[in-house]
């Protein structure tokens, strides 16, 4: 009766092609224990990434193909042991935090807003601007009610107003933040200000500056420990 239709069954299968694939040696750049490991660098697409790459290239970490002309998302220099990932600026800290990249270059605004658990190694001084509270020129804060704040930097705005004990209602927007107080959607905005030209053209003004912004070198915590020599060598050349 052990072999009747109602009996339980146990079986297994071997996929020889899969076993062969898994047992094959890794390409040289992926092998562990080699003399020089890859240093994976996340660069933001756009002007900031171009400037950062220029600094790295000048320090001897230029990619083997034209960085400005390639459409590839990964470029590398095997001789220098570096590999560049080109990602959205808002994703740099995510790649670094989770170990897909060892280091990255990211704006302080994005880094603070994301709350990524990474090491901040160096202020590059690139992309300088300010995180500000801005509003109408004649704005007077009515402390008897919650302040309506429009911003895309929700965590930064909340932390700032918590630090001064001010109740707020946050209105999350993704663009054209300056429009919110003009249309009465918010009392003020929290946003990055570089020159202030857009504010002036819309009859708004900076009411408070509370965070300097610039591009920072960040590192994955495990990578900082296990690739310390490579990281410090790169930073010392910058």
Regions found by a protein language model. Name each.
Residues 1-34:
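TRNA-recognition modules of translation machinery and tRNA-sensing kinases, especially anticodon-binding
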